[in-house]
Amino acid sequence: MSPEVNTEKMDHLIQEMKRIAREVELAGGEIPAVVRNVKRLMASIKMLEINVSDVSGILKTT
C-alpha cells in the first residue's frame, strides 16, 4: 500500500519555490550566473507545476 499524496501541500510548496526563485533573481541583479541559474530553476519548477500543480487543480474540481 502506497502512502497518501497530499497534492495541495505539494502545490503550495511549488508555488513557494517559484516565489523564492523570483526573489533570488531580483537580489542577484545582473550577475550572469544568477540569471542563468534562476532561469534553469524556473524551468524545473515549471515541470513540477505541470506534473503536480495541474493535477492538483484537476483533483480539486472533481
Show which residues each predicted segment covers.
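Short, charge-rich amphipathic interface segments used for partner binding and complex assembly
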Residues: 29-62
